[in-house]
Amino acid sequence: MDFIPSFWIILLRCFSTVRLEIKNEVVIKDPKEQSLRKILNFGHTIGHAVESFYLESADKENLTHGEAIAIGMVCEAYLSNKLLNFPSDKLIEIKEVVLRIYNKIQLLDNNFNAIIDLLKHDKKNVNGQVNFVLLNDYEDFELDCKVSTELIVESFKFYNL
């Protein structure tokens, strides 16, 4: 049976030293990021855009890489719920776990467009299209998912609730 990490192991790889062992096993199985390795990108598409936005200006609060990826995980779980019917109870569970680990950093409405513009520069984009790894369930994911700008904005608003 092929190694497919559960969602909680994926979550741990973002927040603990266990992540290196998991990442190494996934990278060994998919060294060219053709399929399985892409699961390591869950939360990173939005997370990297949020991180870049906060790094652009000294007047914004400090944001760690982990905090940015945590925001991305909540937003991308929301997108998973809306597009792939990822269970609502698991969406809430992800948000609650993330907010137990990190303090909430409010994403201001007037910053949404700037963050979305930064998404367009993600290295995983193909032909100008932002690609997401989204969840059907904790151990079932879809690669290269396309998402509308409106739904991305909705995910920011969900995170802010």
Task: List each language-model region with its residue ranges.
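C-terminal charged capping/lid subdomain of soluble metabolic enzymes
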Residues: 86-161
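A glycine/threonine-rich phosphate-anchoring loop and its flanking beta-alpha core
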Residues: 1
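Active-site segments that bind and position negatively charged phosphate/pyrophosphate groups
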Residues: 4-113
